[in-house]
Swiss-Prot record:
It holds the Pfam family UDG. GO terms for biological process: base-excision repair, AP site formation via deaminated base removal. Keywords: Cytoplasm, DNA damage, DNA repair, Hydrolase. It catalyses: Hydrolyzes single-stranded DNA or mismatched double-stranded DNA and polynucleotides, releasing free uracil. The keyword Translocase does not apply. Its main location: cytoplasm. The active site is at 65 (proton acceptor). This is Uracil-DNA glycosylase.
């Protein structure tokens, strides 16, 4: 079969791509991309995996499904393409980053610098219809992304999992909490950020955990201009 991810994730996830449920998902997506407006564009679907190879993952920030507005989604949780206004949840992430570590907020939402350092920006569902949040839930993506979470959890090198909001926190059951670090809080959405996201200090806690593992901490400060490289 055609190789869909061009790094070590391919071998990790190949059994999923060869499964019956993925064949059904593939057929569903062919129909959807033919007859509907679907985000992200097809070539961006697996961008989170492309940007952060399995062996390089230090941190996972788990999202739900892609942004469903024009030109926003590009396959990575919370990140948006350059030239698009920073969405409200990401604005709140920047506020927490500033109060936690003193990072200066930037006026773009392109999180590639994080991904390049080992932060896997993973949504549990990888596609969505334009303007219809959660419209591709229950078609198979969850099985594939659950398999990715479980594979990381069982890897000898531990991972810091950042779970914001109920949907992400429900994934905790997939994670071996004896060997990995799990940081949980409310979602950064304006609807819930004041109920435990603000003040949760996930970025400094992540770096403390990484340093305790003997890993390099993440430089969370994003560049003023988006880095396309």
């Amino acid at each position: 079969m055609k190789q869909l991810i061009h790094n070590d994730w391919w071998e990790v996830l190949k059994p999923q791509f060869e499964s019956a449920y993925y064949a059904q998902l593939h057929n569903f997506l062919k129909e959807e991309y033919t007859h509907q407006t679907i985000y992200p564009e097809m070539h961006h679907i697996f961008e989170a995996f492309e940007w952060t190879p399995f062996s390089k993952v230090k941190v996972v920030i788990l999202g739900q499904d892609p942004y469903h507005g024009p030109n926003q989604a590009h396959g990575c949780s919370f990140s948006v393409l350059p030239g698009v206004p920073v969405p409200p949840s990401l604005q709140n992430i920047y506020k927490e980053l500033q109060s936690d570590l003193g990072c200066t907020p930037v006026n773009h939402g392109y999180l590639k610098k994080w991904a390049d350092q080992g932060v896997l920006l993973l949504n549990s569902v990888l596609t969505v219809r334009a303007g219809q949040a959660y419209s591709h839930r229950g078609h198979g993506w969850e099985q594939l992304t659950d398999a990715a979470i479980h594979a990381l959890s069982e890897r000898p090198k531990p991972v810091v999992f950042i779970l914001w909001g109920r949907a992400a926190r429900n994934k905790k059951q997939l994670i071996n909490t004896k060997t990995n670090i799990v940081l949980e809080s409310a979602h950064p959405s304006p609807l819930s950020a004041n109920r435990g996201f603000f003040g949760s200090r996930p970025f400094s806690k992540t770096n403390e955990a990484l340093q305790a593992m003997g890993e390099q901490p993440i430089d969370w400060q994003l560049p003023a201009e988006p880095n396309y490289r």
